[in-house]
């Protein structure tokens, strides 16, 4: 019975392409159009949910701003937006005379999220095409002004949002976020594989909730002695599990703003400086290649 069911499904889908499918495939992928005024686009992604990806995106964006960069932060999680809470930005954005949204700003970071366009208690129930259309609207229907970096916080997994961004926006690179859990690492490997197939550079991995610091003896306590993190692209930083980070998230004040002299602020500054160096090297190599031609 099971074999019959599999064969039936196979016959239903493994058929000759229709004329419309042939025409659609002949068009190829959409041509990536730059976002007006935006120099670099960095995606923050994860395979599993709950690994702290949005926390990393928010504090990374704020750390770039503290370095003097002009920064925007786009919440690409259409179904579960958290940027309004984490950045304490609420209310609908103003629309200018060109029908472009003006992103509100906090902590010197311009922010935009689907959470600003829908009531908190309202869920978004959309299929793929609507999600992809919403992402394009948030990206290109916004007056970002002049930005050095646009950070995009994406939903977990490898779904429509990731594909839409990769196909429509010139992504400079990706930062992957994971915890040391085997399950999280395995799914992050799948995400890395997807971006490699899409020819999007992977800057590295942020390992979150790697350890904690004992409040009594100040000793570093590792949660996972054996981890598969080494199977992922190069590690950028390892972050601790700490109640102050959770407290910062709840209060809408990123930890790098609330505790500017803390170890966490130092680590995120280190991340921002390293990514800035990578961007500078990329630009230098690109200029050299252009000169050679």
Swiss-Prot record:
Subcellular location: Mitochondrion membrane
UniProt region (CXXC motif probably involved in coordinating iron-sulfur cluster binding), positions on chain: 214-217
Molecular function GO terms recorded: 4 iron, 4 sulfur cluster binding; ATP binding; ATP-dependent FeS chaperone activity; iron-sulfur cluster binding; metal ion binding; phospholipid binding
Cofactor note: Binds 1 [4Fe-4S] cluster.
InterPro entries: Mrp-like_CS, Mrp/NBP35_ATP-bd, NUBPL-like, P-loop_NTPase, YlxH/NBP35
Requisite cofactors: [4Fe-4S] cluster
GO cellular component, one term: mitochondrion
Pfam families: ParA
One GO BP: iron-sulfur cluster assembly
Family: Belongs to the Mrp/NBP35 ATP-binding proteins family.
PANTHER family to which the protein is assigned, alphabetical: IRON-SULFUR PROTEIN NUBPL
Functional description taken from the UniProt entry: Iron-sulfur cluster transfer protein involved in the assembly of the mitochondrial membrane respiratory chain NADH dehydrogenase (Complex I). May deliver one or more Fe-S clusters to complex I subunits. Alleviates pausing in mitochondrial DNA (mtDNA) replication at slow zone 2. May be involved in mtDNA-helicase-mediated mtDNA unwinding and replication by transferring iron-sulfur clusters.
Official protein name in the record: Iron-sulfur cluster transfer protein Nubpl
């Amino acid at each position: 019975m099971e074999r019959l069911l599999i064969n039936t499904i196979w016959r239903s889908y493994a058929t000759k392409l229709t004329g419309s499918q042939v025409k659609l495939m002949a068009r190829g992928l959409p041509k990536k159009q730059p976002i007006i005024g935006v120099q670099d686009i960095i995606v923050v992604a994860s395979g599993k949910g709950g690994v702290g990806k949005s926390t990393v995106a928010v504090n990374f964006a704020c750390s770039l701003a503290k370095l003097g960069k002009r920064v925007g932060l786009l919440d690409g999680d259409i179904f579960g937006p958290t940027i309004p809470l984490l950045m304490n930005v609420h209310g609908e954005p103003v629309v200018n005379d060109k029908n472009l949204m003006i992103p509100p700003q906090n902590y010197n970071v311009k922010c935009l999220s689907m959470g600003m366009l829908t009531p908190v208690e309202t869920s978004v129930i959309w299929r793929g095409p609507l999600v992809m259309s919403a992402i394009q609207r948030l990206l290109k229907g916004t007056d970002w002004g002049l930005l050095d970096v646009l950070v995009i916080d994406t939903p977990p997994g490898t779904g429509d949002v990731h594909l839409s961004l990769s196909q429509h926006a010139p992504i400079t690179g990706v930062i992957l976020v994971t915890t040391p859990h085997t399950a999280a690492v395995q799914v992050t490997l799948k995400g890395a594989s997807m971006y490699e197939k899409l020819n999007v550079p992977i800057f590295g991995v942020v390992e979150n909730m790697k350890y904690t610091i004992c409040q009594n003896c100040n000793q570093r306590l590792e949660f996972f002695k054996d981890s598969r993190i080494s199977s992922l692209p190069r590690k950028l930083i390892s972050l601790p599990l700490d109640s102050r980070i959770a407290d910062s998230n709840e209060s809408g004040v990123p930890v790098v703003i609330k505790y500017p002299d803390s170890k966490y602020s130092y680590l995120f500054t280190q991340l921002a400086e390293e990514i800035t160096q990578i961007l500078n090297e990329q630009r230098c190599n690109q200029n050299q290649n252009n000169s050679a031609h």
